UniProtKB/Swiss-Prot annotation:
One Pfam family this sequence matches: Ribosomal_S3Ae
Protein family (similarity comment): Belongs to the eukaryotic ribosomal protein eS1 family.
Superkingdom in the source lineage: Eukaryota
Subunit structure: Component of the small ribosomal subunit. Mature ribosomes consist of a small (40S) and a large (60S) subunit. The 40S subunit contains about 33 different proteins and 1 molecule of RNA (18S). The 60S subunit contains about 49 different proteins and 3 molecules of RNA (25S, 5.8S and 5S).
GO biological process: translation
Protein name in UniProt: Small ribosomal subunit protein eS1
InterPro entries: Ribosomal_eS1, Ribosomal_eS1_CS, Ribosomal_eS1_euk
Residues bearing the modification N-acetylalanine: A2
Species this chain originates from: Candida albicans (strain SC5314 / ATCC MYA-2876) (Yeast)
Alphabetical keyword list: Acetylation, Cytoplasm, Ribonucleoprotein, Ribosomal protein
Cellular component annotations (GO), alphabetically ordered: cytosol; cytosolic small ribosomal subunit; hyphal cell wall
Amino acid sequence: MAVGKNKRLSKGKKGLKKKVVDPFTRKDWFDIKAPTTFENRNVGKTLINRSTGLKNAADGLKGRVFEVCLADLQGSEDHSYRKIKLRVDEVQGKNLLTNFHGLDFTSDKLRSLVRKWQSLVEANVTVKTSDDYVLRVFAIAFTKRQPNQIKKTTYAQSSKLREVRKKMIEIMQREVSNCTLAQLTSKLIPEVIGREIEKSTQTIFPLQNVHIRKVKLLKQPKFDLGSLLALHGEGSTEEKGKKVSSGFKDVVLESV
């Protein structure tokens, strides 16, 4: 007779359930703080596993990038179509001090701008700020009907589009290279550069819906804790930042 396993025998404690451990008991919550350039500094919260042994929680948090709607940061629905990227540069207690990492438009806003009977002008330029951040800035614009125009279409000639694009690149290089990253952020919120492009190209061809649609951070200088703390205020405990007015003027350019 073949000898096999008796399935009727009890198999010890296999039937007992394992103790369920809540994974959130091993995690800590941290507050994300935006720079004082934005009105609302409390972006939200994020979590990470607690520091254990040689694993430090701060190392896992540094470099994290968060995408936030500009309407939430400014408390105004007028900015709902723009997204700001914030990067964690320093951990202070339970606060994460962030810095500007990029800007982008929502896809629905970009699609709503493109229409028939008009020409689209796009330009991009790689430029370094005065505090050594290398950025790639993308601009978008559309041709507009001239005063007393009867014709339905507003198409521009290729030569005119080249002139407009050249002017756009020139303005973006000038505006970005003469300011710091914090000053550039203050310009991007009220769309100062877009209005400057629209005003300067009137003699070439009238434009409408001129926007800086994207800002990409390519390279950043060596980390400086002092400048980051200055960007967040000395105590970095204020919940409100300073309001950027729509009629913003760059103080640095005036002094130069």
